[in-house]
Amino acid sequence: MSVAPTKVKFFFGKNCTGESFEYDEGETVRFNYGDEWNDKFMSCIVGASVKCNIWEHNEIDTPTPGKYEQLAQGSTNNDLTSINGLSKFQVIPGDFQWAVDVKIVDNIANTPVGSYEMTLIPFGVPQVVCRDGDDFVQMPIPQLSPADSEIVTQVAVRDTRTGVYVANGSCYFKYDPSTGQVSIRKPVETFPPNMDTVQDDNTSFIFNLNATA
């Protein structure tokens, strides 16, 4: 049994048996309490060119972080019950270590969906781009040394109707290799004053655009 190099295949049964579902590189999937597939995946096959980060919990406000594990490229994982119920996973490129999931929300009145485009550029890493109205976009980060180092990330937002940039600055992301949780630091001196962020789960951040100046 195999899977395409850029995919992960999850199974409802142990030993890669039962109904299965495939997910592509760049996908982050989370199940909430009560969702049909929450805690249901029991085994998986990871493609040769991707890794898969898996979590017991996805809520940032869970009293304890829960279990976290990274599944290696090309691995067959016959029993995932050690995670105590799979609630979230990321399929990331094999040469990266972790990922941040980001989206922009336009809080400016009377603007059509897609009016603002956010570009995030982590130091030394290809940029990711998303527009208001889009779902979360995965931003993979390579192995840092030490592993819990901060990575500075440029933040820029432009008006897609005029091409004018309405926000520009930077922030810092940090990864905890023991829990898989990501945190953000936004220095007053560098973070755009017309924006704020909300952490939506253990790796996901909503960037709110509150004004154009």
UniProtKB/Swiss-Prot annotation:
GO-annotated molecular function: calcium ion binding; calmodulin binding
Family according to the record: Belongs to the Dictyostelium CAD family.
Cellular location(s): Cell membrane
Keyword set, alphabetical order: Calcium, Cell adhesion, Cell membrane, Membrane
Protein name per the record: Putative calcium-dependent cell adhesion molecule 3
Gene name per UniProt: cad3
GO cellular component, one term: external side of plasma membrane
Organismal lineage: Eukaryota, Amoebozoa, Evosea, Eumycetozoa, Dictyostelia
UniProt record, GO biological process: calcium-dependent cell-cell adhesion via plasma membrane cell adhesion molecules
Function: Mediates calcium-dependent cell-cell adhesion during the early stage of development.
Membrane spanning stretches: none
